[in-house]
């Protein structure tokens, strides 16, 4: 039974004093820090102190707070809707779950996130209910009136799962988004049926929740690279053992029917307990070798469970086909000039693959233009970030649109179709970039397009550098005047032309 009276995510009652989360750089994230460490000045603060001590009048770029204030002032103009939710503990991943209810002015939907703690309370996988306001419903003057330190009334905790270790990645099964996979600092992938898992109280000393399945096969920690197949119940993972591992969980899911609301659940085993070791295990369907360093991300083809790709710290992009064996089909040796962090396969066009890297760029590859030995350049390089790119994802709403988030605190929205369109005006922004979400004040570690609600995105930032800890979750939708065809927008604005002109003529 869902309840809107449930406690909001990250209740203050279970957090340490000061509400700080974690620190110390971790690959694409970080480890929680001690309370003493939370008092250490951030790099921005240290830089400001050095500037004051030097006494030099050097022209500085706007500070994080100044940029944020500028952005917040533009929220009523740029956004159709925005909800800001303070996280006392940071979350390294965020994902949309199934839509629960549709109403006149808003929809209710599951949201998956996590709490990465310092050990004073357990690490958790959080299942929340989110109220998603429908387009053109929220008043412009209201969406920018939020307190950065407050929890959003649109996000309510529904259930807590005590996770064995911190949650680095969450991925939902497309055929049944009530089933999710998680990565932690271990070789295993954990599978959870979030609807049947009991709600737990996260207090120090509480036993871990018991995963419904454990996928084994890695020989070293597999921390981030994780994907679930859009066509079949297959799971893909990559890790420090330089391998890509494929599993099928078909035999462990009961299929009740074709209705998405009752599409199946994890087959339950007899016996009770919360010990992870009591959970049933599933061995790999295949183990694939070809990387020379840690595999950082993986993605399935949108049309086949047998085809997938991976990227890693060896700067390689590798395409695989399980039907041809365990060796790479195509290996792009120098896909970027640094470590690759993320990859996504276009769900509308299975020839297009996006990659993001520590070289601050996003690159677009067309697999038809790659030879078997990896010879072939990206068809475009998107340059708009000033720090390492952490996440890329194609939009479910338009085949040429995608998002990228980075350590510079920005979430950029791009349209590849706009790259080729020439403009008489001098380019003031990178080619293809048409929207920049600047609502986060620190690295944006993950985001997810909402397939049930067009142009709606959830994003999370890890705020250790700017606020000393914790994180920020934002749910937002840009104004449709930004992405709709120009002729449609002009026609709509013409209706208000006389009113605008009248207002402009007044003293």
UniProtKB/Swiss-Prot annotation:
Q: Which PROSITE patterns match?
A: WD_REPEATS_2 (PS50082), WD_REPEATS_REGION (PS50294)
Q: What is the effect of changing residue 241 to N?
A: In allele fve-2; loss of function allele that causes increased levels of FLC and late flowering
Residues that the record marks as modified (N-acetylmethionine) are 1
Q: Name one Pfam family in it.
A: CAF1C_H4-bd
The induction annotation reads:
Induced by dehydroabietinal-dependent (DA), a diterpenoid tricyclic diterpene that promotes flowering and systemic acquired resistance (SAR).
Q: In which tissues is it expressed?
A: Expressed in rosette leaves, cauline leaves, main stems and developing fruits. Expressed at higher levels in roots and flowers.
Indicate which residues form the motif DWD box: 308-323
Instruction: Tell me the GO BP annotations in alphabetical order.
Output: cell differentiation; DNA repair; epigenetic regulation of gene expression; flower development; gene silencing by siRNA-directed DNA methylation; regulation of DNA-templated transcription; regulation of photoperiodism, flowering; regulation of timing of transition from vegetative to reproductive phase
The places in or outside the cell where this protein is found are: Nucleus
Q: Where is the composition biased (Polar residues)?
A: 258-272
Which SMART domains does the UniProt record give?
Answer: WD40
Superkingdom is Eukaryota
Q: Where are the WD repeats?
A: 95-137, 162-202, 217-257, 290-330, 335-375, 384-424, 439-486
Q: Name one GO cellular component term.
A: mitochondrion
Q: List keywords of the entry alphabetically.
A: Acetylation, Chromatin regulator, Developmental protein, Differentiation, Flowering, Nucleus, Repeat, Repressor, Transcription, Transcription regulation, WD repeat
Q: What does this protein do?
A: Core histone-binding subunit that may target chromatin assembly factors, chromatin remodeling factors and histone deacetylases to their histone substrates in a manner that is regulated by nucleosomal DNA. Component of the flowering autonomous pathway which positively regulates flowering by promoting transcriptional repression of the flowering repressor FLC. May promote histone deacetylation at the FLC locus leading to the formation of repressive chromatin structures. Forms a histone deacetylase complex with HDA5, HDA6 and FLD that represses FLC gene expression to control flowering time.
* Subunit text: Interacts with AHL16 and HOS1. Interacts with LHP1, PDP1, PDP2 and PDP3. Component of the PRC2 (polycomb repressive complex 2) complex which regulates histone methylation on histone H3K27.
Q: Record's family?
A: Belongs to the WD repeat RBAP46/RBAP48/MSI1 family.
User: Domain notes, please?
Assistant: The DWD box is required for interaction with DDB1A.
Name listed for the protein in its UniProt record: WD-40 repeat-containing protein MSI4
Q: Which organism is it from?
A: Arabidopsis thaliana
């Amino acid at each position: 039974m869902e309840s809107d009276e449930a406690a909001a995510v990250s209740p203050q009652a279970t957090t340490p004093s000061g509400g700080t989360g974690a620190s110390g750089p971790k690959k694409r994230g970080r480890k929680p820090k001690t309370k003493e460490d939370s008092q250490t000045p951030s790099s921005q603060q240290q830089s400001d102190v050095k500037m004051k001590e030097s006494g030099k009048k050097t022209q500085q770029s706007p500070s994080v707070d100044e940029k944020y204030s500028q952005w917040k002032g533009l929220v009523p103009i740029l956004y159709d809707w925005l909800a800001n939710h303070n996280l006392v503990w940071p979350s390294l991943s965020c994902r949309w779950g199934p839509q629960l209810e549709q109403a006149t002015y808003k929809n209710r939907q599951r949201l998956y996130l996590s709490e990465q703690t310092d050990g004073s309370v357990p690490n958790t996988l959080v299942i929340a209910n989110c109220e998603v306001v429908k387009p053109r419903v929220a008043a412009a003057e209201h969406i920018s009136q939020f307190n950065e330190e407050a929890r959003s009334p649109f996000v309510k905790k529904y259930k807590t799962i005590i996770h064995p270790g911190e949650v680095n990645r969450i991925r939902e099964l497309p055929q049944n988004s009530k089933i999710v996979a998680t990565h932690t600092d271990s070789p295993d992938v954990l599978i959870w049926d979030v609807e049947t898992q009991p709600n737990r109280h996260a207090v120090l000393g509480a036993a871990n929740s018991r995963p419904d399945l454990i996928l084994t096969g890695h020989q070293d920690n597999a921390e981030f690279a994780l994907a679930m197949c859009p066509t079949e119940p297959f799971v893909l993972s990559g890790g420090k053992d330089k391998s890509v591992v494929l599993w099928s969980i078909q035999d462990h899911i009961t299929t009740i029917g074709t209705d998405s609301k009752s599409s199946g659940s994890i087959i339950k085993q007899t016996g009770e307990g919360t010990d992870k070791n009591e959970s049933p295990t599933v061995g790999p369907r295949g183990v694939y070798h070809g990387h020379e360093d840690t595999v950082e991300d993986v993605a399935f083809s949108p049309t086949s469970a047998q085809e997938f790709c991976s990227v890693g710290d060896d700067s390689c992009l590798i395409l695989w086909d399980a039907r041809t064996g365990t060796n790479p089909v195509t290996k792009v040796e120098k896909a970027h000039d640094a470590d690759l962090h993320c990859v996504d396969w276009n769900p509308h066009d299975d020839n297009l693959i996006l990659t993001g890297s520590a070289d601050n760029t996003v690159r677009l590859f067309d697999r038809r233009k790659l030879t078997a030995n990896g010879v072939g350049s990206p068809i475009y390089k998107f340059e708009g970030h000033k720090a390492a790119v952490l996440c890329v994802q194609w939009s479910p709403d338009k085949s040429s649109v995608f998002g990228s988030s980075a350590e510079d605190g920005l979430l950029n929205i791009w349209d590849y179709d706009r790259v080729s369109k020439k403009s008489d005006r001098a380019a003031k922004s990178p080619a293809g970039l048409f929207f920049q979400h600047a609502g986060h004040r620190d690295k944006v570690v993950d985001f997810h397009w909402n397939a049930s609600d067009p142009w709606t995105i959830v994003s999370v930032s890890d705020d250790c550098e700017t606020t000393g800890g914790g994180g920020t979750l934002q749910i937002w939708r840009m104004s449709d005047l930004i992405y709709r065809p120009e002729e449609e927008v002009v026609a709509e604005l013409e209706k208000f032309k006389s009113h605008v002109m009248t207002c402009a003529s007044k003293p």
